[in-house]
Amino acid sequence: MNLDEVITGVVLAGGKARRMGGADKGLLELDGKPLWRHVADALAPQLATVVISANRHLDIYQASGLKVIPDSIADFPGPLAGMLSVFQQVAGDWFLFCPCDNPCIPHNLVDRLAAHRHGAPVVWVHDGERDHPTIALINRAVEPQLTAYLQAGERRVMIFMRQVGGHAVDFSDCKEAFVNVNTPEELAQWQKRP
């Protein structure tokens, strides 16, 4: 199966961004463009379609021309809620999720995740030191379990991913590609890089 033809890319831009003082992290600029755009631009050559999952400033995201998927669950309940909203509102079987604060994802992210899926409904990035469960290739088949998990009040991404039979894919050879931007200081450091 050639997954790259049927995978929808999703930029997760719905976090509370507490460490950014509540600012909409996806709209913060790095090198003259919003963080979410860096991720969308990196995903676009790898996938036929890219959408944005967001829960505020929808008009700004919609001005990009990309389809914007609002959360179907109120009160910012986390990335799993954004994922469920995408399953509910976008056709297709496979979705590649990536948070808006990972501006340097590798050009072969989709191919590597798909190649190491080995039949699992969920695979995510491991950078050699830590898991990145929100950078994940996920099949719609997990939607019923995800719905039940969220209805039970659960929010922990890693636990859910393991419960549905997922596993990590090793990206230790490009660990630096998964450094994210969480604080104003980190954003300033990114701005200073060569």
UniProtKB/Swiss-Prot annotation:
EC class name: transferase
Keyword annotations from UniProtKB, A to Z: Cytoplasm, GTP-binding, Magnesium, Metal-binding, Molybdenum cofactor biosynthesis, Nucleotide-binding, Transferase
GO biological process, one term: bis(molybdopterin guanine dinucleotide)molybdenum biosynthetic process
Location relative to the cell: Cytoplasm
One term of GO molecular function: GTP binding
Entry EC number(s): 2.7.7.77
Entry's Gene Ontology cellular component terms: cytoplasm
Binding site for Mg(2+): D101
Catalytic activity of the protein: Mo-molybdopterin + GTP + H(+) = Mo-molybdopterin guanine dinucleotide + diphosphate
Family annotation (InterPro entries): MobA-like_NTP_Trfase, Molybde_CF_guanTrfase, Nucleotide-diphossugar_trans
Residues given in the record as GTP binding sites: L12, A13, G14, K25, D71, D101
Cofactor: Mg(2+)
Free-text comment about domains: The N-terminal domain determines nucleotide recognition and specific binding, while the C-terminal domain determines the specific binding to the target protein.
Family of this protein: Belongs to the MobA family.
Assembly and interaction partners: Monomer.
Function: Transfers a GMP moiety from GTP to Mo-molybdopterin (Mo-MPT) cofactor (Moco or molybdenum cofactor) to form Mo-molybdopterin guanine dinucleotide (Mo-MGD) cofactor.
Protein name stated in the entry: Molybdenum cofactor guanylyltransferase
